[in-house]
Swiss-Prot record:
Residue ranges of the propeptide: 201-203
List of residues that carry Cysteine methyl ester: C200
Gene that produces this protein: RASL10B
Outcome after substituting V52M: In a breast cancer sample; somatic mutation
Biological processes, Gene Ontology terms: positive regulation of peptide hormone secretion; regulation of systemic arterial blood pressure by atrial natriuretic peptide
Assigned protein family: Belongs to the small GTPase superfamily. Ras family.
Main EC class the enzyme belongs to: hydrolase
Compartment list: Cell membrane
Gene Ontology MF, one: GTP binding
Protein name: Ras-like protein family member 10B
Gene Ontology cellular component terms for the protein in this record: plasma membrane
Pfam families linked: Ras
Protein EC: 3.6.5.2
Alphabetized InterPro entries for the sequence: P-loop_NTPase (IPR027417), Ras-like_GTPase_Reg (IPR052661), Small_GTPase (IPR001806)
Length: 203
């Protein structure tokens, strides 16, 4: 049986979220930054542990605020489909403090607008541009501790430029989404467990 998962990728301008997606799908990277101005949909099929998953990856342009309801979601063409995904990937640039603040704000808004009684939607925080480690503005341990211990989210650092931890990111994403119904196991713990197992490949 093929599972279908919708995933939203969000982040401030220039953090490299589209580069992450394209590196994952096409194994390519461009030094030229082309801002995302409209929602882009990618439909890859991924095999993990012998199971096929159809992904609907929604790459969104930077949004000023997360839509508080369905009416607001569909009133803005850039936000359509944002509230009905199975997981969120929130990307920031490890060399840009403002991009982390953006992720912090969007995450909080996602939690505040979540419909009461609905199941937990996994949120994974991604620190991109790991290849620019010397320009890091927040120590990795500080961010990791905040995200995993306080926010209870998964955390991965990657480099879209060098394809470092890109496949790992999406492998753990699939695992987290698949375990989202395990209500008695914390999301962050599920994610960390996934880091030690499972492999995926694009068809």
């Amino acid at each position: 049986m093929v599972s279908t998962y919708r995933v939203a990728v969000l982040g401030a301008r220039g953090v490299g979220k589209s580069a992450i997606v394209r590196q994952f799908l096409y194994n390519e990277f461009s030094e030229v930054c082309v801002p995302t101005t409209a929602r882009r949909l990618y439909l890859p099929a991924v095999v993990m542990n012998g199971h096929v998953h159809d992904l609907q990856i929604l790459d969104f342009p930077p949004i000023s605020a997360f839509p508080v309801n369905t009416l607001q979601e569909w009133a803005d063409t850039c936000c359509r489909g944002l509230r009905s995904v199975h997981a969120y990937i929130l990307v920031y640039d490890i060399c840009c403090f403002d991009s982390f603040e953006y992720v912090k704000t969007i995450r909080q808004q996602i939690l505040e607008t979540r419909v009461i009684g609905t199941s937990e939607t996994p949120i994974i925080i991604v620190g991109n541009k790991r290849d620019l480690q010397r320009g890091r503005v927040i120590p990795r341990w500080n961010v990791s501790h905040l995200v995993r211990k306080t926010w209870k989210c998964g955390y991965v650092e990657c480099s879209a430029k060098y394809n470092w931890h890109i496949l790992l990111l999406f492998s753990e994403l699939l695992k987290s989404v698949g375990c989202a119904r395990c209500k008695h196991v914390h999301a962050a713990l599920r994610f960390q467990g996934a880091l030690r197992r499972n492999r995926c490949a694009i068809m």
